[in-house]
């Protein structure tokens, strides 16, 4: 069996060199002139376009050529697709992901087959006929268990006249893909994350199953050998230099052309976005991809693979995606990244997403452009839709008051520990006592506070999601929760740093701010409770 990992080991240095060129090695005008064919681009041609685009005026020229190529070779349609998450438990430590194993604030859910079927009935009633099953690397969700969910999806789609089943999962072996194909899987989605080996290792901690770089590179060879020839490939833009990774994707796609006569079925274009409780994703890094460079990558992909579907998702704003999507692409409108969250809206998931207009409105916009909306049928009545949690859900105020009292008591303990540290931090015994107290408080916050935040999102958010007065506060609460997760990560790092430096300055400043913000959050939360609002009115 062919292996791309062996091929890429020989091509890596060439791709690295191509990514760094500052001047085109081929005339961009000639590349764009000959690009009006179904043959696409090779890495050298794409590298010349990236180099030419260092001149901003060239970017519009490249995008115009890409749109013309798509209009000629791709079908006049856009395919709708909806992700359905099965589990948020994960054994991996990917520094950018909200579901990384050590993230204390991540909501962990296994979606039972019964709940999956209930949610799928709701999704199908909305008209969706292309379903992407998504799961993290959960040892309890092996390929045989996933096969049951694939089979259930296939049965329901066939009962409605057919549709497509895609899967984004951990990498599997050839026999696993055979089994999944037999029960109804149509195509597989998998992102390499980054093709750069050393940066791949930096983003994925040792001990993670995902750290097996070669196995990930070769998964398409295994899937194709298993009879799955429709594949979605790509990278997570922002983990390394976007030119290198985009060129590596193009090299991989051309390998599939040469070796198997297969075009990539879809190309992923996700950008690194903030994830709850994940410090590495919260701020730009030197590889962050600007909107203009994102547009460039999309245009070059459109030229490189004129018939492949670019996978537009809700990580990006609606306006940005609508300015880039072209004939033949994939488009996501509804996106919940927590298992079961379509039944209970407004719950946090794997990463930050944008709200989009209603699916009917989006389809109508495409139709006005001359693009038919595929895999989105007319909506049907569904009893499940009326049982989705709504505003006005009863709230157990006594339980909330008790939890708030406990949290306030621990915040006071924390404040006292910081005060002792500021006064006596230079004395070894006092330092040891303060350190032990702070570590106990940190562990408490990582469990109790994060649980409280999750309960707030699962109970208060549905209860007040349609309340015009409360909605702005809910948006602030979600931002608070994300900041708390990041701050807990920072606090843990600062405690380790203090143990080495013996300088408590940063620890004291960070702790004081966190205490102040948590108290303000609890007070704002209490202002939402019905009894408080009644007293305010009275």
Language-model-detected regions and their locations in the chain:
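Auxiliary Fe-S-binding modules of radical SAM enzymes
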Residues: 1-54, 124, 258-391
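Small-residue-biased structural context
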Residues: 389-538
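Core AdoMet radical
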Residues: 101-115, 123-223, 230-232, 261-268
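N-terminal pre-triad scaffold of radical SAM enzymes
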Residues: 62-103, 108-134, 186
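Catalytic cores of alpha/beta
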Residues: 173-182, 240-254, 317-327
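Active-site beta-loop-alpha junctions enriched in small/polar residues
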Residues: 85, 136-138, 168-172, 193-195, ...
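Conserved, mostly hydrophobic/aromatic
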Residues: 38, 66, 94, 190, ...
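Glycine-enriched alpha-helix->loop->beta-strand junction motifs that scaffold or abut catalytic
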Residues: 180-187, 227-229, 306, 325-332
